[in-house]
């Protein structure tokens, strides 16, 4: 109601102002006419009243007495002093009444217009503010003033034009009305504003957090004159870092894994923090790539350093960890506890040495947890019961030498055969079941402990599942095939320990490796086998311990010795073209041919 009263009062003040302007103009016009009459009287001699003038005045007085106003002359006739003095009282009265006639009628018209204006304004105010629509006040004033001017009897064309110009000038100069605090609060708490703000802030937040190149051309026109793969390698860019000041500080990243059910989730395991002896020795943190939050999604811990970790492939809520004490622990994110919901016993039936290898293999209806410890013991578990292993086997070479396993990998689609790397630098093939269960072939080539091993994962028109790569303390990465016990190729571009290696899950010729100098290398064997296709060194040059590709192959995660996890976007380098499989097959043929030539040259030198 206060807004309506203010608007009504404002309109009344505008009307009064217009009336004052009209009165002022009228007064000035009368003064001007009076001055002109005085000037003319001074210039011209006073003529004697003629008989015609006297009769005209009598006639005009008679007409005015009966209510008829005579037509005013176009040019005002100067009046002599004698005529003023001779005029009778009746004439003076009739003249006064004649002069006041138009003014009286104009005032009556103004009263009528004011009443009509009150009737017109109220509905417009209600309609305008019932919709809570903010409109400029000057617009209403302009419309109403125009209506007012149309209803008032016009004084003349010249006066109307002047008044319209004055009104337009006032409208232009009038500043927008400032909203009161009450009106602002009403808008801020209105349902429409809250819905709009809630929807818009989500869009703006996503736009501010988006780091990808929105101008990328998927048609590839920008790469037509360049080597597409090499150019895409430049897209290896830093995405984000996972680090928690409390749980990650002074800990080493020992293992990482991505969730199959939720591709944005990754779990990382950490060893003990020597500066915090009262904190749990083992920690596993679940990080979320989807949101730009800096804290882990879940925090799990146990009393022994976690050396290996993985998501239970067919159980999206379970996380499996292998500890330095030999225990296998199981965490459940549905539980409110951060400690394991299940764990294996510390007994001779299970592991009693550090477990560096945990892996869930099988199908949805038939799967097992496979674990291997550094004493060469392999156990098969059911995730429903970790009190005792379903199967156990000693990995022994020549029936006397236990294999100190440091890494394990299963070929794609195989749950029986696998390969393991050992502390002495030897790689073995092994089998879980059958007449040849246990250690099979021996692959010698590394001069130091094997730190990482991974089988070819990309599925395509040509089967490369027999290939695997290994990394070692001897500063090299080697390419192997299960069909031959000698390495196919040795990549020797690193100048420090190579701690881990992994094939791309989508590109047949691409793998990543990390070393002790904090360098991440991406090798595309279809481009070059001598130098990496793309490389990046992390800030601080901390040693990189682990590397893991995301399921889609677009991102690669690396963990360092300071507890930090670095996520890098690989870009178009990770996207395979249709001919990548055939090109890689030709590359392997060339590698085998070069290896055969080298062996022949070596044999010739030995014979000589």
Swiss-Prot record:
Its main location: cytoplasm. GO terms for cellular component: cytoplasm; cytoplasmic dynein complex; kinetochore; microtubule; spindle pole; vesicle. The keyword Transport applies. GO terms for biological process: transport along microtubule. It is found in: Cytoplasm; Chromosome, Centromere, Kinetochore; Cytoplasm, Cytoskeleton, Spindle pole. The modification Phosphoserine is found at residues 50, 83, 90, 94, 97, 142, 160, 598. Acts as one of several non-catalytic accessory components of the cytoplasmic dynein 1 complex that are thought to be involved in linking dynein to cargos and to adapter proteins that regulate dynein function. Cytoplasmic dynein 1 acts as a motor for the intracellular retrograde motility of vesicles and organelles along microtubules. The intermediate chains mediate the binding of dynein to dynactin via its 150 kDa component (p150-glued) DCTN1. May play a role in mediating the interaction of cytoplasmic dynein with membranous organelles and kinetochores. This is Cytoplasmic dynein 1 intermediate chain 1. It comes from Bos taurus (Bovine). The lineage of its organism: Eukaryota, Metazoa, Chordata, Craniata, Vertebrata.
